[in-house]
Amino acid sequence: MKYRRLGKTGLHVSSVGIGTWQLGNHWGKQFEQDEVNNIFARASELGINLVDTAECYGHHVSENFIGQALASSRDRWIIATKFGHNRRSELPGEAHWQADQVRLQLEASLHALKTDYIDIYQFHSGTREQLDNDDLWTMLNKQVQAGKVRYLGISIGQPSQLYQVDRATALGVSVIQTIYNAINNKAAETVLPSCQRQDLGVLARVPLASGFLSGKYQPDAQFPVNDVRAERKPEVNQQQITQALAVLENVPANVEPASWACAWCLQHPAISSVIPGIKTIEQLQINAAGADL
């Protein structure tokens, strides 16, 4: 495994981390704790030290799995989680973006993750209006001062949300998470240069384009109802799979497509780490191999 500096945080993260939306049981698979424990044990053996999650991945389900799995090895892991999409009944409408409600989400995430601090706490795919909330960022920076959060981040919904990236330094944000992969590299045009100017760490999410760059899918692929990809229009999936298959024609015969896709992202000097999702140890190992290509 290779390691990269996470911007101005000074942290050194594995160039391949772990994304954990799948652990929220939203991607066609139900996980058990023993299975998750084995995945993280193998990840440690491979030198991976970064995991990204969110409170909305199964309403803390993913965080709970991670908290159990890392209970005895917390200090060697850099844990990133997110806020803003809490769907509990006591947080109706847009209230989950307000400072007092985000504070509740933070406490719930700390409890689920079984830790007294979160390394990177990220604003999760909100709007410009939701970002421009002085009370929210004042509260979050107080959590940094209190030691409950080490660094703040913004996970932008789309690369077009450059305003949020450009505001990072003023808000006390050190890390940006963005979509970046071989079929959607729009972030390279504006987002990544802004991150470089501000010395922000960058986490590249969906580096496998929702799994389509793994080479496992054909344009007529169907997904089970408990898989988020089933919620998309079939023609959208079909188009993305077709694009992915065209890109994968560039992959050498002796290289796994997913390894290549991770390595493709890591070619850009602004990228600190890629955070592909996984369902199995085999997928974990294939992704990790991308660090050495």
Where are these regions (language model features)?
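Alpha-helical scaffolding within the catalytic cores
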Residues: 1-4, 105-107, 163, 187
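N-terminal binding-site loop/beta-alpha segment at the start of enzyme catalytic domains
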Residues: 1-77
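Conserved, mostly hydrophobic/aromatic
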Residues: 6, 18, 36, 43, ...
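Active-site mouth loops of central-metabolism enzymes
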Residues: 22-34, 88-103, 125-130
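Short, acidic/polar
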Residues: 30-43, 97-114, 159-167, 261
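A short, structured active-site edge motif that brings together acidic residues
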Residues: 76-88
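Active-site groove signature of glycoside hydrolases
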Residues: 110-129
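Beta/alpha (TIM)-barrel catalytic core signal, keyed to glycine-rich beta->alpha loops juxtaposed to Asp/Glu
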Residues: 126-293
